[in-house]
Amino acid sequence: MFTGVATALATPFQENGQLNLEAWAALIEDQIKEGVTGLVIGGTTGEGMTITDDEFETLLVRAVEVANGRAVIIAGTGSNNTAVSIEKTKRAAELGAEMAMVVTPYYNKSTQAGLIAHFTAIADASPIPLMLYNVPSRTGVALAPETVGELAEHPRITALKEASGDISVMAQMMAHIPEGFTVYCGNDDQILPYMAWGAQGVVSVLSNVYPGATVALAEALLAGDLQTARTWQIRLLPVIDELFAEVNPIPVKAALQARGFEVGAPRLPLVPMSATAEAKLLSAMEQFNEVRQ
């Protein structure tokens, strides 16, 4: 488990489309240096749906090596095929992952009973703790608060990344979970309200680009310093808006390139950020950088 910030890492590619492991190591070092306490490999931001199993394993092994115990390694092992998710989770544990982040099965549109059966089967087979991932805008299905409450009774289902974007859902989640179960915010523009409701941190896209500022925001909230937290959240909002002006991870890869990390373009079916949107993103970053100085 972690508190504070876990970065949903972007996956760097070379110009030929192959993994850029040098950039991968540099990105991880930057995250740890800035105080990030968790690293998510192969999630949405990491283009988990378009990297191969071999690439996923290569990224995971290298992340474990570079982090060397300095951050919690979280593997994105979700699938809409329960058996595939089970095997991927077991393999991730063998390679050194300390936790698995498992998204709700997409496209199938499971019932709540199906979601309970799906996650229970994965948890029963998993040697490491699971973080449920609720992101209905991408998957077409939402975890009901009552479902999360039931799943939270499983000893290996220990956390939830709540990315519905609905503050009222967060409130309902907190009303249904048992003591000791951890909720993390999954939306960078809602870190303050989610943590005010009791989330223990954020699984962040923003922290790829501004890890230190994201950590400062989360740490202020953990310390109960709402004034400082509000200041950070407000300053970061223009950048956050532009980081989601096109579908994630298109903008974050453009932002990382601007920061000097050779992450390359996203893989098809995603394409690089439009020139107009990128100009707005870079302008927002420049303005934020000026405010920080």
Swiss-Prot record:
GO MF terms, alphabetically ordered: 4-hydroxy-tetrahydrodipicolinate synthase activity
Binding, pyruvate: 45, 203
Chain's gene name: dapA
Name of the protein in its database record: 4-hydroxy-tetrahydrodipicolinate synthase
HAMAP family listed in its UniProt record: DapA (MF_00418)
Assembly and interaction partners: Homotetramer; dimer of dimers.
Similarity section: Belongs to the DapA family.
Pfam family, one: DHDPS
Active-site residues, Swiss-Prot/TrEMBL: 133, 161
Organism field: Exiguobacterium sp. (strain ATCC BAA-1283 / AT1b)
Taxonomic lineage: Bacteria, Bacillati, Bacillota, Bacilli, Bacillales
InterPro entries per the UniProt record, alphabetical: Aldolase_TIM, DapA, DapA-like, Schiff_base-form_aldolases_AS, Schiff_base-form_aldolases_CS
Reactions it catalyzes: L-aspartate 4-semialdehyde + pyruvate = (2S,4S)-4-hydroxy-2,3,4,5-tetrahydrodipicolinate + H2O + H(+)
Record EC number: 4.3.3.7
